[in-house]
């Protein structure tokens, strides 16, 4: 039997099979060809992700406690990581669509964390992937 931890859609007790939502594979984004427009798209997506994570953090804090909600807080901090933001900006300047730039840069960072010899840091690779997928 597998055990999982997550946030319920509705409070209470449920009986039945659990469903784990997995985001579908990436759509093929098309760059507008204008790096400034792509950067603006990215900035808007980051702002939306920040709002989503803020709401999720507040819900998790109430339902799971501050310690477990800290995972969401870590993702909110990642949205401000200069290395990540500069990596995305460089990819956009190189002609990438905002979505590709965000996802590819996130994957590069996640791979670095996944390769570390520390279990805690390995787990952060999933947080990085979740954060970059939340943006797009």
Role assignments for model-derived ranges:
Residues 1-136:
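Non-catalytic, soluble scaffold/interaction modules
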């Amino acid at each position: 039997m597998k055990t999982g931890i997550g946030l319920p859609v509705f409070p209470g007790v449920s009986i039945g099979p659990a469903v784990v939502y997995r985001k579908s594979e990436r759509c093929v984004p098309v760059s507008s060809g204008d790096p400034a427009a792509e950067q603006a798209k990215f900035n808007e997506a980051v702002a939306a992700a920040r709002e989503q994570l803020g709401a999720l953090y507040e819900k998790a804090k109430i339902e799971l406690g501050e310690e477990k909600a800290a995972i969401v807080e870590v993702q909110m901090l990642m949205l401000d990581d200069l290395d990540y933001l500069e990596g995305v900006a460089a990819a956009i300047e190189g002609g990438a669509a905002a979505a590709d730039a965000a996802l590819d840069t996130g994957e590069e960072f996640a791979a670095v964390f996944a390769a570390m010899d520390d279990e805690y840091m390995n787990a952060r690779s999933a947080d990085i992937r979740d954060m970059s997928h939340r943006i797009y």
